[in-house]
C-alpha cells in the first residue's frame, strides 16, 4: 500500500478556503511472485458508496490492512474532510483471485446510537 499526494487530482477547498491536495493510493498484492492486485484508488473509486456532497469536499485519507478472512484480505479505507474528524469508513475485500469488493462501514455512533454512552 503506497499513499501519495496526487497533484493530477482536483484540489479540495474547505469552507475556510484552505486548499488540499488529494491522495491516490496504490494497492499491490503478490503471491509467490504472481501479481494478484495492482490498482490505484482515488476518492472517486468510492463514489458509489459516498454521498456526492461529502465527496466534493473530502480527500482519500488512507488504506490500511485490517485482517484476513475466508472471504479474502480485508482493508479499511477512509474518506474524510481534511484536518477534521468527519470521515466515511469503507471496507475493501480482496478475494484470492484478486476480485475487489467495496462496502461502506457503519460508524460506531450509527451502530450504537448517539446516547449509547451515558453517565
Predicted regions and their residues:
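Surface-exposed acidic loop/strand-edge motifs in secreted or periplasmic proteins
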Residues: 1-62
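Structural motif
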Residues: 20-26, 83-90
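Residue-level signal for secondary-structure boundary sites
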Residues: 35, 83-85, 100
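Beta-propeller fold detector
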Residues: 37-44, 101-109
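A short local loop/turn or secondary-structure capping micro-motif enriched for an aromatic residue
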Residues: 45-48, 83-84, 109-113
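Acidic, glycine-rich flexible loop segments
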Residues: 48-89, 95
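C-terminal or internal capping secondary-structure element at the end of a domain, subdomain, or sheet
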Residues: 89-107
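Short, solvent-exposed mixed-charge patches
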Residues: 117-119
Amino acid at each position: 500500500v503506497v499513499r501519495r499526494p496526487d497533484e493530477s487530482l482536483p484540489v479540495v477547498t474547505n469552507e475556510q478556503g484552505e486548499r488540499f491536495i488529494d491522495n491516490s493510493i496504490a494497492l499491490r498484492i503478490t503471491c509467490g511472485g504472481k501479481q494478484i492486485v495492482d490498482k490505484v484508488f482515488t476518492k472517486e473509486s468510492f463514489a458509489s458508496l459516498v454521498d456526492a456532497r461529502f465527496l466534493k469536499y473530502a480527500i482519500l485519507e488512507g488504506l490500511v490492512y485490517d485482517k484476513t478472512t475466508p472471504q479474502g484480505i480485508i482493508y479499511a479505507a477512509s474518506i474524510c474532510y481534511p484536518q477534521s474528524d468527519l470521515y466515511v469508513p469503507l471496507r475493501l475485500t480482496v478475494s484470492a483471485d484478486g476480485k475487489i469488493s467495496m462496502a461502506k462501514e457503519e460508524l460506531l455512533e450509527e451502530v450504537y446510537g448517539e446516547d449509547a454512552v451515558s453517565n
